[in-house]
């Protein structure tokens, strides 16, 4: 047994050494790798008003797959010294000009350097084809945001957190499991996108028969997309609303399809994801190692949120006394997108301050 272990370690070491030698080759140096040039809008085009308490600028950074991500950076006015930082993204299918930007700006008002970023293949970020979701690449997006924040001269690299909204709440927790640089994580009104993709809403499609039917349909769509040379879009939030739409669909419509939250770069506001984007989510499960997450997590949900079960079930998988579940009285799922009377922003800021103390 000892000989077998030694052989495995030797093989692993040789692979890692080979990779190290490749990275030392100037032809593979990240510093000379081609970087996507993004056309970024410089005017204020958010769905929320600009704060006079923070400074704002556009920034870009590159993830491990070479995709350039676009972000809005918010810095407290008259900031001095190194500050704690938070990367924000979500909801799933939204853009940084919507809910994530509001959270980022609000937290900057409370003393944090923040960025709200567009995930790969969406918004102003790079990547092709457009409107593709990937549980692997999207968790990498959050870690890439941490890469970027870690090297900023005004950021305390030992005090970096992440905040994910809706589907990006689950992605934030999954990233934190694998990235111990993330000292604290907040998942607001979270979805587990891998669960809903495989099992349907409220787990009503949780059977091999239904999943196999979905796989067959998506496989056929792949063939059709390849034949056509383009990707069929799934459509954003349904519009007009059917008379029998569930309340949570009405709530989505009230945000994404009205001046309250509509943005032309948002998939949810327009024509949605590529139909086949659901495939990798069906084939991947978050939170397999959730019990190993040592750093702090806060999960918050509205009392009336249809998505509440995602957060409560995920919370049960976490270990340690630095995990919190906060239920907001009377709030729906979408109330926690932009309703500042419902979003416990001070509690969120206090959580980050407590769990990311200055050393």
Segments from the language model and where they lie:
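Conserved alpha/beta-hydrolase
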Residues: 106-126
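Short beta-strand element of the alpha/beta-hydrolase
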Residues: 81-91
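Alpha/beta-hydrolase-fold enzymes
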Residues: 173-257
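The serine-hydrolase catalytic nucleophile loop
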Residues: 93-105, 119, 311
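Catalytic histidine-centered segment of alpha/beta-hydrolase-like enzymes
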Residues: 331-342
């Amino acid at each position: 047994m000892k000989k077998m272990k030694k052989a495995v370690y030797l093989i692993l070491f040789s692979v890692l050494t080979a990779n190290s030698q490749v990275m030392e080759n100037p032809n593979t140096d990240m510093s000379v790798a081609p970087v996507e040039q993004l056309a970024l809008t410089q005017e204020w085009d958010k769905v929320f008003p600009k704060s006079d308490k923070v400074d704002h600028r556009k920034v870009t950074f590159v993830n491990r797959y070479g995709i350039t991500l676009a972000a809005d950076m918010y810095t407290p006015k008259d900031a001095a010294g190194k500050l704690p930082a938070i990367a924000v993204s979500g909801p799933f299918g939204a853009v940084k000009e919507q809910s994530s930007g509001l959270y980022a700006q609000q937290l900057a008002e409370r003393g944090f350097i923040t960025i709200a970023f567009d995930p790969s293949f969406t918004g102003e970020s790079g990547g092709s084809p457009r409107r593709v979701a990937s549980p692997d690449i999207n968790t990498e997006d959050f870690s890439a945001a941490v890469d970027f924040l870690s090297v900023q001269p005004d950021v305390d690299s030992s005090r970096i957190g992440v905040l994910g909204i809706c589907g990006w709440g689950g992605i934030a927790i999954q990233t934190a499991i694998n990235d111990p640089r993330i000292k604290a994580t907040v998942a607001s009104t979270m979805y587990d996108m891998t669960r809903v993709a495989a099992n349907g809403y409220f787990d009503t499609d949780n059977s091999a028969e239904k999943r196999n039917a979905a796989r067959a349909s998506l496989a056929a769509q792949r063939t059709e997309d390849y034949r056509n040379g383009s990707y069929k879009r799934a459509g954003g939030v349904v519009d007009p609303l059917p008379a029998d739409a569930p309340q949570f669909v009405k709530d989505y419509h009230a945000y994404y399809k009205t001046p309250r939250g509509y943005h032309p770069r948002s998939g949810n506001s327009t024509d949605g994801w590529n139909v086949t984007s659901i495939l990798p989510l069906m084939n991947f499960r978050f939170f397999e190692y959730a019990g190993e997450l040592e750093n702090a997590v806060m999960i918050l949900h509205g009392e009336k949120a249809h998505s509440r079960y995602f957060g409560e079930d995920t919370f049960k998988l976490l270990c340690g006394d630095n995990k919190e579940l906060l239920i907001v009285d009377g709030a729906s799922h979408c109330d926690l997108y932009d309703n500042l009377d419902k979003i416990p922003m001070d509690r969120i800021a206090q959580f980050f301050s407590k769990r990311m103390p200055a050393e």
